[in-house]
């Protein structure tokens, strides 16, 4: 049986649902784009040891897709590794949009479909 990966922290991006992560984990619950940006910057280079749990619909102008695009750009600009991610959005179009941001990153920079594709 494979052991679950231990992360430095979980960033839970959702304006409605509370984190569905054991309370023994380091969790940052952010509900807006601005809170997300602030939290990611606070983690700095440690962001590459985190996992981000994305919701798409945040009830404001910017959504989870905007957060994903900003995260990839910020990691690239600062030469930080891109964190693992999970998408808990019930919005199928939003889910696919967020996935496409990460898929594009892996295709462009590593010529792979995803982080988990065999080399």
Where are these regions (language model features)?
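Catalytic phosphate/metal-binding cores of nucleic-acid and nucleotide-processing enzymes, i.e., regions
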Residues: 1-119
């Amino acid at each position: 049986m494979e052991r679950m990966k231990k992360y430095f922290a979980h960033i839970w991006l959702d304006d409605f649902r509370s984190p569905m992560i054991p309370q023994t984990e380091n969790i940052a619950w952010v509900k807006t784009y601005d809170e997300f940006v602030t939290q990611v910057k606070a983690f700095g280079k440690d962001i590459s040891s985190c996992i981000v749990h994305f919701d798409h619909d945040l009830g404001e102008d910017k959504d989870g897709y905007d957060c994903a695009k900003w995260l990839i750009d910020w990691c690239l600009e600062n030469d930080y590794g891109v964190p693992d991610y999970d998408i808990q959005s019930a919005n199928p179009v939003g889910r696919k949009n967020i996935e496409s941001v990460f898929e594009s990153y892996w295709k462009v920079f590593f010529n792979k479909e995803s982080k988990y594709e065999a080399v």
